Amino acid sequence: MKRLCSPVVVLFLILSGCISAPDNIRDVRELRQDHASYFTGITKSEDPLPAAVQTRMDEDYNTIYFSVWHQNRPFHALPDRVYHDFKKYSLKPGYGENKKLHPPSWLKKLQNNASLNNYPNTLSRGITTRNTNLRELPTSSPHFNSSDGDSSAWPFDNLQRSSVSANTPIFVCHVSADKSWALVETSFTYGWIPVEDFASVDDEFVKIWESGRFAVIIRDQTSILDKKDRFLVRGSVGHIFPFISNASDKMQLSVAVADRHGKAVIQRGFAPADAAAVKPLRFNPVNAAKIANEMIGEPYGWGGLYGNRDCSSMTRDFFTVFGIWLPRHSEDQVKEAGTYIDLRGLSPEEKERIILQKGVPYLSLLWRKGHVMLYIGPKGGRALIFHNIWGIRTKDLQGREGRKIIGQAVITTLQPGQELTNIDSSSGSFLDNIAAMSILAPSGRENPAK
């Protein structure tokens, strides 16, 4: 005689780990992870961002992007901020790559090497020659809040401020005592990078580099080669280079490399024609879907670690292709760009109604504390979003907190993981916590919910 498990027993087995839950949340399983599939014939013909407006936005982008070459003192890396970076880690030494607490000598050595008693000691211009990482302290070693855990240990290295692509303009503020690290600013933040990852630039280089048109990479992991097919640098969506010319199979770009004296020189580089575009790429639904599909399924990368993206670097790189400037931090992206709409204090139903009514697909950002999302449009009366997300908070029967790991860029509803039996709803649902929307398209536009 066969014995059947009751629903209660099955639920207990799932919660206790005896039966594996589905690897992906329901939204990822059931929603097509293809941006092109969400456009109707109407949306394909819409022009939410007039060409003249996009051109002005791109000009503003370039002005901000190159601003570091036209300053003579730190803008982001103010002394108090730099000193604070060391002070906060003196109070919380954290854990290293070996899952052991950093000894007090770890930070002391970094402080001595930083030699901040004469900060800033350099004040010069440069350009990155490699894809690199801006670190809060002059070290590649990590700092984790705990030795293990879904949100306090790997991959959440507190010292990772942001990745920076090759050939990004920088302002060099300070060089460490051993000359191996430099504290630099980009147009969007600051941090320490290895000195071998950048080269110095002079007035002539700046004049040449800033002149003319620019190209932007539109395919991840694109190898840019020299005229002899030798590797120069790897580009991904949102990386910018001066444009030289276009051919049927290749786009010719300017690439900055370091000479033996550490000075930047310009070489000609070549990218596949379908992997690059003249910046800005015209914004329309087809192109928006094409660029978003380049990022779909990409692994989550905290602060851009391992060449991947977190939520805000994904949105930032997406909009760079279209010449739309965004800050680096998720909250700043919503509060400092576009038309801000406060959603706090509203019911989940009211929030979704406003998002559907006022949101412009692929030109609107949604924000909850620590996370930014791209609104991509309606489906069946529900709003859909595209975001690179680490996971959904969970809590088991013993009250232990955890994460249902998603760990990639996905299309979901505003309630991802709502079907999880162990979802942690103590602080409200995902939609409950969405606090604001920013519309990057010209104001005054509303979209009927479909």
Stretch-by-stretch model annotation:
Residues 2-10:
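Sec-dependent signal peptide recognition
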Residues 15-17:
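C-terminal motif of bacterial Sec signal peptides marking the signal peptidase cleavage site
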Residues 19-43, 48, 188, 196-216, ...:
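Aromatic- and glycine-rich peptidoglycan recognition patches
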Residues 22-147, 151-155, 162-166, 171-173, ...:
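Boundary regions of SH3-family modules and the immediately adjacent low-complexity/disordered segments
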Residues 157, 227-228, 274-279, 297-306, ...:
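Second-shell loop/turn segments in exported
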Residues 163, 327-396:
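...with weaker cross-activation on analogous glycine-rich loops/strands in unrelated enzymes
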Residues 200-201, 221-267, 298-309, 367-418:
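Glycine-rich catalytic cores of cysteine/serine-nucleophile enzymes that process amide/ester linkages
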Residues 292, 302-333:
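Active-site nucleophilic cysteine motif
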